[in-house]
Amino acid sequence: VPKKEKPVIHPVSEKSVPEKEKSVIHPVSKVSKAPEIAQINPSPYAFGDLPDNRLLPVRGHSRMNYTVKWAKKTKKHIDIASMAGILRLTPMTPEVIRVSFVKGVTTEIKDTYWKPEATDVFSWSVRESKTALKVSTEKVSAVIDKKTGAIQFETADGTVLLKERSVEPRLIMDQQTWEFFEWDSSEKINAKGILSTDLLVLRAKAKYISFGGKPMRMPLVLSRKGYGLGIAAKETVLLCNIKTYGPYISTLGEDQIDYYFIYGETNEETISMYKKLTL
């Protein structure tokens, strides 16, 4: 009886498999991130709201000592200590200086919702005399009086733009802050609304300049002298330009004073620089 031939099994080459039968492995696509939801300012006050006059006087307190005890410069900022707390100046650009203050010498200065430090390299310096510390960029200087701790902002040629009050220039108390400025009596002060053309008049007035109930936006004060103040606060911000009570800029829900001095020379340039402080 003839033996049955064993079936020969040939290995199947990749080429012999029809295209339709090939298993195709598709790369797994990354899960797309949901769009970020803008943080809302929780303040109950809308931009331009009038405050209750009973809230305008600064509450009674023991006067703090802001005399400069020591200063320490790093590559990014300078810390200036007093018995009241730590004042930090952070040059952001040649035209912008961030000013931060916390109560107590052991308290850490925190980042805010906005840009914390410079992202581009540029030259800045600190000069010390018997009476003052001078932090300078190519465009602007901040001069700190050693006796009072108050800051005076100047142009490169020494023209004074803005002064903090010499007696107790700033104050933090029970989650509320006050930053006292000495605006000239003839100086026109405005707060920028949502639109660049929406300017709130603040001469001899007190108004809320934060955007309660709206997506997070930094309040911006504009002066006809060519500078602006960006207030890095996430809740209520009140500007009181009434001499009986201030003048001051106050925040609620904050335990750190934080603002940007912006010297754009014109409102348009100042607003452009302000927009670049958003992360």
PLM segments and residue spans:
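Catalytic and substrate-binding clefts that recognize carbohydrates or anionic sugar/phosphate headgroups
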Residues: 81-82, 125-279
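N-terminal functional modules and adjacent low-complexity/disordered segments of proteins
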Residues: 4, 20, 35, 42-45, ...
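Exposed beta-strand and adjacent loop surfaces of beta-rich binding modules
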Residues: 86, 96, 150
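Mature N-terminal segment immediately following signal peptide/propeptide cleavage
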Residues: 77-89
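A low-complexity, Ser/Thr/Gly/Pro-enriched, surface-exposed linker/loop concept
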Residues: 37-71, 75, 90-133, 169-174
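Short linear motifs in intrinsically disordered/low-complexity regions
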Residues: 11, 27, 42, 50-53, ...
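Long, intrinsically disordered low-complexity tandem-repeat segments
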Residues: 2-29
